[in-house]
Amino acid sequence: MLAGMEPNPADPSLHVPGALVPHDMAIPSYLRRAYSWAYLDPRTLRWLDRPGVVSAILWGNANRLMRDAVAEFAPGQRVLQAACVYGGFSVLLAQRVGARGALDVVDVAALQVANARGKLAGFRQAKVSQADLSVPGCVAAGAYDGVCCFFLLHEVPEAERCRIIDNLLAAVRPGGRIVFVDYHRPCRWHPLRPVMSLVFRSLEPYAQSLFGAAIESRSARSAGFEWTKTTCFGGLYQKLVGTRQG
């Protein structure tokens, strides 16, 4: 790139050509059934998409968790963000990859796509698309330097969860990295354990099933990655980082 020239978001060298494979798409029934109030209603979106609300939902850990996830990526990388996120996460990730990088944000809900586009309007390196990441082959193999899945897996049923994980692992190029940040089974002594059990039963119907097995065990592709897992806040949250070998 010549000095003084700004990156062009339409430039195919910035966003990966054909990284998102076209497919038939509809709002999944599980999303309508369990999360219409949170992700498909513009009235609640305006209330939920506030830094203070996001911080409260994560018991004051939102900024810490976002920073820790974003720090796993580097300027100039092509990164896929799986699902839109309330709060400032996408902006932080766009800032991290910088003007010479590219951020593709993907969500199945048109409302969330429109909302994220508004947040990222000032970042020419960012692109937001509508796609269902549980559709096999929806992302081209090896298309990204990095993939980030921030608090998505606990919101999908097990079958869809396994397909999403498999698709995201396939999207990482050799030497690239994938980062999962999500809930984790808290320590027995955790004072919030009873509260979170109630939250999961009443508001997050698929969360408990996430704890039944390690995230990486849900795809055979994980054998091609080196994994590091850390937990924080008494084990309530986890960060799983995989680096693809080869």
What is the predicted role of each segment?
Residues 179-223, 227-236:
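C-terminal alpha-helical "lid/dimerization" subdomain adjacent to the S-adenosyl-L-methionine
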Residues 98, 156-157, 172-174:
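Helix-to-beta-strand junctions that scaffold the AdoMet/dcAdoMet cofactor pocket
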Residues 162-174:
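A short glycine-rich, Lys/Arg-flanked "PGG" loop and its adjoining helix->strand segment in the class I
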Residues 145-159:
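A short SAM/SAH-binding and catalytic strip from SAM-dependent methyltransferases
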Residues 78-136:
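Class I SAM-dependent methyltransferase SAM/SAH-binding core
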Residues 56-76, 88, 92:
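Conserved alpha-helix/loop element of class I SAM-dependent methyltransferases that forms part
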Residues 1-49:
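N-terminal, positively charged/glycine-rich alpha-helical extensions of SAM-dependent methyltransferases
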Residues 134-147:
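A short acidic, Gly/Pro-enriched loop at the edge of an enzyme's catalytic core
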